[in-house]
C-alpha cells in the first residue's frame, strides 16, 4: 500500500501529539528583552515516577523508496524529537489501543523548523533521518519496559 506524505501542521497532527515550532505561536520577552520565550510548546508526560531524559539521537538517512514494516509506541511517556540543525524529516503515526489502527495511519513531512512530541501510546515509526545524517534533541522517559512494537502490512511512503 502507498501512504501519502502530508505537510506537518498542528491541526493535522493534534490527535497524535504536538508540533514544536515558533511559527504562529505566542511568546514573551525574558532576560531584559534579549530573548523571546516560546513557552509550553508541548506536554512532556512521564508516568511511574521515572525521570525525564534529554538525549541526542544521531539518525541515519533511510534508503528510498522507504517501505514501512512496523510501528512502536511508548505507554509510559511522551517522546519528543527536535532536529538540531534545521533538517527536514518524516514522521509516520497511527492511533490504536492494542494494535495500530491502520485507518488512522498518517505520514507527515516537517518544514525544517519543526519538531514533534508524540503523545503517550501513539503508534509511530522508529526515528530515521530524511536526506542526511541528522542529530535530534530527544526528550523522553528513562527506564525500561516502555516500548511496544507491532508489525504492520507493508506501506510505501508516497510524496505528492
Swiss-Prot record:
GO biological process, one term: purine nucleobase catabolic process
Record carries keyword ATP-binding: no
CDD domains: cupin_UAH
The enzyme's E.C. designation: 4.3.2.3
Family: Belongs to the ureidoglycolate lyase family.
InterPro entries tied to this protein: RmlC_Cupin_sf (IPR011051), UAH_cupin (IPR047233), Ureidogly_lyase (IPR007247), Ureidogly_lyase_bac (IPR023525), Ureidoglycolate_lyase_dom_sf (IPR024060)
Biological role stated in the UniProt entry: Catalyzes the catabolism of the allantoin degradation intermediate (S)-ureidoglycolate, generating urea and glyoxylate. Involved in the anaerobic utilization of allantoin as sole nitrogen source. Reinforces the induction of genes involved in the degradation of allantoin and glyoxylate by producing glyoxylate.
Phylogenetic lineage: Bacteria, Pseudomonadati, Pseudomonadota, Gammaproteobacteria, Enterobacterales
Pathway the protein acts in: Nitrogen metabolism; (S)-allantoin degradation
Protein keywords: Lyase, Purine metabolism
Protein name per Swiss-Prot or TrEMBL: Ureidoglycolate lyase
Amino acid at each position: 500500500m502507498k501512504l501519502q506524505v502530508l505537510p506537518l501542521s498542528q491541526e493535522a497532527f493534534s490527535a497524535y501529539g504536538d508540533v514544536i515550532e515558533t511559527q504562529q505561536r505566542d511568546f514573551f520577552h525574558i532576560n531584559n528583552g534579549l530573548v523571546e520565550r516560546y513557552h509550553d510548546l508541548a506536554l512532556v508526560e512521564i508516568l511511574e515516577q521515572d525521570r525525564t531524559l534529554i538525549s541526542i539521537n544521531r539518525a541515519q538517512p533511510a534508503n528510498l523508496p522507504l517501505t514501512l514494516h512496523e510501528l512502536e509506541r511508548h505507554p509510559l511517556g511522551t517522546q519528543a524529537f527536535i532536529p538540531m540543525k534545521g533538517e527536514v524529516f518524516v514522521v509516520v503515526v497511527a492511533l490504536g489501543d492494542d494494535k495500530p489502527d491502520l485507518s488512522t495511519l498518517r505520514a507527515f513531512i516537517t518544514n525544517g523548523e519543526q519538531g514533534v512530541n508524540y503523545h503517550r501510546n501513539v503508534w509511530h515509526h522508529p526515528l530515521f533521518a530524511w536526506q542526511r545524517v541528522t542529530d535530534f534533541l530527544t526528550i523522553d522517559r528513562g527506564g525500561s519496559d516502555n516500548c511496544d512494537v507491532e508489525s504492520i502490512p507493508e506501506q510505501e511512503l508516497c510524496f505528492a
